[in-house]
């Protein structure tokens, strides 16, 4: 089955601008991956399309209201006739990692909620959210950038999105290691040469050099 990712946001055009390009954009057009960006304002009953209000107990800023978010979520549930795995992009969430991206790839439907303003009414989070994810210990204007990172990292792992599985299984972080140094033409640039052990080989003989200290010496010896 093709994975479907739904993103609930106040700025769907911002998300589409990124997810409509490059590998993810091509995968969407080829039917290898579904991504739908929903404007939360489309699900409010307020005639001014308002989706926020002042928090009880005081405090600065505004909070996103429950109903527009819940209505958007319910609409997606009806579209897919199932309950998606719901992620809320939050500074309180678990740090995102390649391992979590690999695990999320197993879901058929993912719904990502992007917060804004001072956050989201806790009640709707308690009602629909399965997990909260953070990109790190810093503050962003909204959850959109985080949602784009998650959608890209998970989406590129789906079958058929990349040309070959080796494209991502040998990448940095996939197996807990960093990717090996790589080189292309010209053979000399700013006085720096491509390692002779690589430049002297025919293309069909070039293999990767491990970054794992335990196997680095073995791989270099094989290249010599």
Residue ranges: model-predicted function:
Residues 65-116:
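S-adenosyl-L-methionine/SAH cofactor-binding core of RNA-modifying enzymes
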Residues 120, 124-171:
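Structured adenosyl-cofactor binding patch, chiefly the S-adenosyl-L-methionine
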Residues 1-77:
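N-terminal nucleotide/polyanion-binding subdomain common to many enzyme families
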């Amino acid at each position: 089955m093709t994975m479907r990712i739904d993103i609930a946001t106040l700025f769907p055009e911002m998300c589409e601008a990124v997810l409509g390009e490059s590998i993810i954009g091509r995968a969407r057009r080829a039917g290898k991956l579904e991504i739908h960006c929903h404007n939360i304002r489309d699900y409010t009953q307020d005639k001014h399309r308002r989706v926020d209000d002042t928090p009880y107990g005081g405090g600065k800023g505004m909070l996103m209201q429950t109903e527009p978010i819940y209505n958007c979520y319910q609409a997606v549930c009806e579209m897919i006739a199932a309950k998606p795995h719901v992620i809320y992009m939050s500074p309180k969430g678990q740090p995102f990692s390649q391992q979590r991206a690999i695990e999320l790839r197993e879901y058929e439907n993912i719904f990502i909620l992007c917060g804004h303003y001072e956050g989201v009414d806790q009640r709707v989070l308690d009602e629909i959210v399965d997990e909260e994810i953070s990109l790190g210990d810093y503050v962003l204007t909204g959850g959109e950038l985080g949602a784009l990172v998650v959608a890209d990292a998970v989406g590129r792992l789906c079958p058929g999105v990349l040309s070959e599985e080796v494209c991502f299984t040998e990448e940095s972080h996939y197996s807990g290691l960093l990717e090996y140094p790589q080189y292309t033409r010209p053979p000399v640039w700013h006085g720096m040469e491509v390692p002779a052990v690589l430049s002297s080989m025919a293309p069909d003989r070039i293999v990767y050099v491990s970054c794992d200290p335990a196997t680095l010496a073995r791989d270099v010896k094989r290249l010599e």
